[in-house]
Each structure stands twice: as structure tokens, then as C-alpha cells.
């Protein structure tokens, strides 16, 4: 469960990223965050795993108050929350399998990390994750030889290899063509339904958000202006979310 209690985020330059956000996301939900550029979508997601700190309020992931975590405790917490970015964050000249196994590094001792001594279990978990996103056959190919869509699947497999119950995604399909974007969204949907993973992603493709997510959260100027079922999102709601104010 993810729970925001009166969460606000103000950046050092005075910009308000979030203002008094209250929401709860239960385990197994597929939630899409929509809104204009700069509305606060990325800020909201990045607060969940502490990439952005909270200025005021409290933010819980299960029983952990993320807003109070610092240093080592925060790094330990992040191991259990998968994060997929718009940029794939892969090591180009390394195999797909090893890129995915890097998700296990925080659990390894320094000696094993230095020499890349992954366990048999690490390898099996990574291979299973690649299978779940349909690119098991690419395991021993270098990451830089894959298409954009395939690289994003590697990122998703790496997040699965963390064995976290929550997957956060920050504009995961914005750099992909429409066909490939739908294929990656299919992966998210399948993982949500088959593994009961909580999916929280922000996305600028409204039509994809409405098609795949069961719940829509719309953000405007750092405030939640809609939070409800995707099938209840109307043209009037979208007009309000995306209307420019002079």
C-alpha cells in the first residue's frame, strides 16, 4: 500500500511540485498519472521511493514512513521498490542478463560485486524475469544491440528481479513508437494481473492511460484534480486537466 497524507513538495527555488496531496494506492492496483508537463507527475512518483524528499506531510509504503528515511535506511528501502525510467539506464556493452542481474547487487558483498560473482539463484531469478517480459532469447546479447522497446523491457525485467511488490515508472513509453509503446504497456498489464504487482506510472499518452490503467490520477499544478476509475474519465475532465490558464 502507498499512502500520501497531506504531502507537499517545494523545490529549493520555490517551485511547488506537490500541494497537500492525499491518496491511497492498494496492493495490486494499476494506476496511471496524467497531466501536462510540469504538473507534478514525476514529482509524485519520485516521492514514493525518496528520489524527491517530502517538504511536509507523511508518505507511507506499507508500514514504512518514507518521508522520514535518510541515508542507509533510504537506500535499503529503495531495493524493494522497482523503478523504470524513460531512459533505460542500461550498461550498453554488457549482456542483457548481466544488466538484469545488477538488480541483485545491493544484496551482495563487496567482493562478489567487484568480480561479478552472481549466484545461481540470482541468474535464475533474472532469467525468469526476462521470460516474463518476452525477451529470454536476448539474454546473452549486448544491451546496445537491442531496439528501444527491447531495452525498456530489460529495464522492466531488472525491476522484477528486485522482487519488489511495487513498480514505479516515469514516462516509460514516451520515447517509443506507438506499436512498441503498446507492447510495453501490455507487459505492464500482464505483470499487474498475473503477479499482482502494484503499477504506478506517469504517462503523457492519455489514450494508453485510459486503455491500460484501472485508475487514473490527474495532476494539475501539483494538486490532484481527478482520482477515480479510468472508465469514468470524461472529455470535460480531460479538458480541465489540460486546459492552459493564462
Swiss-Prot record:
E.C. code: 7.3.2.2
Top EC class, one word: translocase
Record PROSITE patterns: ABC_TRANSPORTER_1, ABC_TRANSPORTER_2, PHNC
Protein name per Swiss-Prot or TrEMBL: Phosphonates import ATP-binding protein PhnC
Assembly information from the UniProt record: The complex is composed of two ATP-binding proteins (PhnC), two transmembrane proteins (PhnE) and a solute-binding protein (PhnD).
Domain ABC transporter span(s) in chain numbering: 2-246
Function: Part of the ABC transporter complex PhnCDE involved in phosphonates import. Responsible for energy coupling to the transport system.
Source species of the chain: Lactococcus lactis subsp. cremoris (strain SK11)
SMART domains from the UniProt entry: AAA
InterPro entries: AAA+_ATPase, ABC_transporter-like_ATP-bd, ABC_transporter-like_CS, ABC_transpr_PhnC, MetN_ABC_transporter-like, P-loop_NTPase
Binding sites annotated in the UniProt record for ATP: 35-42
Keyword terms, alphabetized: ATP-binding, Cell membrane, Membrane, Nucleotide-binding, Phosphonate transport, Translocase, Transport
Top-level taxon: Bacteria
Molecular function (Gene Ontology), one example: ABC-type phosphonate transporter activity
Amino acid at each position: 500500500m502507498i499512502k500520501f497524507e497531506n504531502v507537499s513538495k517545494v523545490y529549493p527555488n520555490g517551485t511547488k511540485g506537490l500541494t497537500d496531496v492525499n491518496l491511497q494506492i492498494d496492493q495490486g492496483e494499476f494506476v496511471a498519472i496524467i497531466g501536462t508537463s510540469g504538473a507534478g507527475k514525476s514529482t509524485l512518483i519520485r516521492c514514493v521511493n525518496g528520489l524527491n524528499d517530502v517538504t511536509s506531510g507523511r508518505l507511507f509504503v506499507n508500514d514504512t514512513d518514507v518521508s522520514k528515511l535518510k541515508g542507509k535506511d533510504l537506500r535499503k528501502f529503495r531495493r524493494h521498490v522497482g523503478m523504470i525510467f524513460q531512459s533505460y539506464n542500461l550498461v550498453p556493452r554488457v549482456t542483457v542478463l548481466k544488466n538484469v542481474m545488477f538488480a541483485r547487487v545491493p544484496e551482495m558483498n563487496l567482493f562478489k560485486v567487484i568480480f561479478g560473482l552472481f549466484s545461481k539463484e540470482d541468474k535464475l531469478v533474472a532469467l525468469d524475469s526476462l521470460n516474463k517480459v518476452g525477451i529470454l532469447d536476448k539474454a546473452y546479447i549486448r544491451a546496445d544491440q537491442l531496439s528501444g522497446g527491447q531495452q525498456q523491457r530489460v529495464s522492466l525485467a531488472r525491476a522484477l528481479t528486485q522482487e519488489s511488490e511495487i513498480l514505479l515508472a516515469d514516462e516509460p513509453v514516451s520515447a517509443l513508437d506507438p506499436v512498441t509503446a503498446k507492447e510495453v504497456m501490455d507487459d505492464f498489464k500482464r505483470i499487474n494481473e498475473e503477479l499482482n504487482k502494484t503499477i504506478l506510472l506517469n504517462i503523457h499518452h492519455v489514450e494508453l492511460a485510459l486503455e491500460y490503467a484501472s485508475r487514473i490520477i490527474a495532476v494539475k499544478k501539483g494538486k490532484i484534480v481527478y482520482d477515480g476509475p479510468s472508465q469514468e474519465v470524461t472529455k470535460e475532465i480531460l479538458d480541465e486537466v489540460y486546459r492552459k490558464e493564462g
